[in-house]
């Protein structure tokens, strides 16, 4: 595993070394086709790329989103416990997908059809216990309480926000975000959306409201523009100044 440039290396002030690279250009199209099929067939329940922070970070972020613990078996990936840090924190290309037990064999078969069966592993299961539990050779080697992980995950942003924004609202947001009973928004559309909407005569105008420190507004605008909207970039300061667009 190549650790050059990884988050782990950076926080330890270690520079140099070999960084990950794309070595699987020939397999990439097949991989994308399999993922697309699984998505189309609604077999994928959750998906996360292995990127900043490596495997352990991707798993933690999936737990944060679902508010569920994980029981992870490292036997398929780990030959010796001395390789544990490199395994968990390397940022080589990879993804984690969640599927139902009944869809596991089909998932393996699809990856086998493109020659990637040996690169796909069953890592474990979700758990109602609020813990990330990593096991190797039937021994518990890491046990991380989800609540403490979630607090640590948000801590740096919280400390910055306290200085930048209203500390009272920053504290409220921090407590909200780190509450494991908070399952996020679950929007329900109570009406049927027509498959075809006639917006050729005029483009509906919408404003995408953003605050300092946010990102993703350009991608959101591109998506709305693609389906016929006229998007306006609207900042919180525009509201404060009562600017008319």
Predicted regions and their residues:
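Short N-terminal binding/cap micro-motifs at the start of the first secondary-structure element
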Residues: 215-217
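Intein/HINT protein-splicing elements and their conserved insertion hotspots or analogous self-processing inserts
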Residues: 1-89, 100-205, 213, 222
């Amino acid at each position: 595993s190549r650790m050059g440039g990884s988050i782990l290396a950076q926080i330890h002030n270690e520079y140099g070394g070999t960084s990950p690279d794309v070595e699987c250009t020939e397999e990439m199209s097949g991989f994308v086709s399999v993922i697309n099929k699984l998505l189309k067939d609604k077999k994928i329940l959750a998906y996360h790329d292995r990127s900043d922070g490596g495997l352990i970070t991707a798993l933690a972020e999936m737990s944060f989103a679902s508010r569920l613990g994980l029981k992870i078996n490292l036997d398929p990936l780990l030959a010796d416990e001395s390789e544990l840090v490199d395994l968990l924190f390397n940022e080589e290309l990879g993804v984690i997908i969640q599927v139902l037990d009944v869809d596991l064999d089909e998932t393996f078969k699809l990856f086998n059809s493109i020659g990637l069966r040996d690169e796909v592993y069953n890592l474990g299961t979700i758990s109602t216990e609020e813990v990330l539990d990593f096991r190797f050779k039937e021994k518990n080697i890491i046990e991380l309480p989800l609540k403490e992980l979630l607090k640590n995950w948000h801590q740096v942003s919280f400390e910055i926000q306290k200085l930048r924004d209203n500390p009272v609202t920053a504290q409220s947001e921090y407590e909200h975000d780190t509450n494991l009973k908070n399952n996020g928004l679950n929007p329900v559309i109570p009406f049927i959306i027509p498959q075809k909407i006639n917006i050729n005569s005029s483009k509906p105008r919408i404003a995408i409201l953003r605050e300092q420190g946010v990102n993703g507004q350009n991608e959101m605008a591109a998506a709305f523009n693609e389906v016929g909207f006229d998007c306006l970039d609207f900042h919180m300061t525009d509201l404060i100044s009562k600017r008319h667009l």
